[in-house]
Amino acid sequence: MPETYPYMKGPFEPSFESLYNFHCPDWFRDAKFGLWSHWGAQSVPMYGDWYARNMYIEGSDQYLYHLRHYGHPSKFGYKDLVKLWKAENFDPEELMDLYVRAGAKYFFAQTTHHDNFFNYDSKLQPFNSVNYGPHRDIVAEWRAAALKRGLKFGITEHLGASFEWLNTNKGCDSHGPYAGVPYDGNDKRYEQLYLDNAEYLDLSKPRMHYTHDKRWPPRWYECVREMVDLFEPDMLYSDGAVPFYAKGATIYDPTYESGLKMVAHLYNGSAAQNGGANQRIYFQKDSRPEFFRIGLLDIERSLEDDIKPLPWQTDTCLGHWFYDVRAQYKDHRQVIGLLVDIVSKNGNLLLNVPQRPDGTIDEECRFTLEKIAQWISVCGEGIYGTRPYHVYGEGPTRLNADKRDKAIQSALRTLAPGATIYNREADAQWTPWDIRYTQKETEGKVYAFVMGDARAVSLTQLKEPEKVASVRLLGCGSVPFHTEGGVLSAYLPERLPCEMANCLEIVTRP
């Protein structure tokens, strides 16, 4: 009898205990900053996230938008919308040049979102970007462009949640001229896209992230294995906890079988290519150590409040996940502040750049990336290849989780049990006293990022300030300093090389 979940054998077994032998590769700890294309057919309306679900929820903003722009979802559904995605101006070579200039050391491409439409030449899902819409293998093109420039390449899969998420297309309007007329998701001819999940449609109940339907884990597994085998990614990201989390499940529960075998398959594939050493990373969002230690923890739009003993990653976006003409963007100052704060706490930042349906990014995104590129060209030395100092920083400003919004907090916990509280990412008001530290210990260097606008800087958290041999302002040169009472004082020129987060390189004597 064939295995339900065939996986490559090797040093990693499909158990939590075996996968605890994962060690984060140094390349990721050195890289610090990645960019992400969270892009697909849902970008067509340019009207935000979760469009393929919400267009079937009567009265929702996206339902009304769809009704007025495309027609009723019984007549013009998501199967029709995917055909409008053309990506006619998509130039991964030009975009990747920009992303490298902006400082990205790794890149993620989305293989499929919860919409169950695949962005590559899948042999398992006919509803894909080669057969419909662009008629291009989007993921393969991204991969080629990234590897050509020496970037590590990752894929994100959001398929685990699709079975529950994509059931709204089985409904119908409750009132109005189309009352009782089934949405097109009820048409069995399109079940490969819309799925056989009508029995789970009940909008009066909270939505589960992962289904309990026994048919779905094998389907998820064969599709994600296809992705891993096709693209041999350095990183695999699951949008949720380890599949297939169920409430109350322990690390020994068989509900995790498909997820654990996928991680073992991922790692053993790398070990086979690297003399037994795994160089790949699996990301998921359950922040309980007994679960996330099989890879690295990813916290969506969230931050940590102190240095973490293990590397971790925040993923966020300049605007909304999918292109939205209404979105208010982060500016370069906010992104730089996030990056420095995250790196000071042993983390990496993964930033999504929203793309229009034609494949381009807008001028606001381009401007932001160019400004980040200017900053990284000056201060990147204090970011790449560094490790946390004994403290992450000093000063009054804290970027940590916003615990006030209980609704958002509750929603995130349905995505991943034990998840770090959602952070609203309000733009920090950095003061002249705010400092963030990194170090290259083997080189005897500490880096102090002066987050606010300051000319006289006092550093109170250096381990041995009396051993400081020199202080250099990156992008400028040596600056005068003195130490007294355990405090190092440095004096910066009136004209600073960067508009924020200027970086001091502090070299100590042995």
Where are these regions (language model features)?
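Mature catalytic domains of secreted/periplasmic carbohydrate-active enzymes
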Residues: 1-510
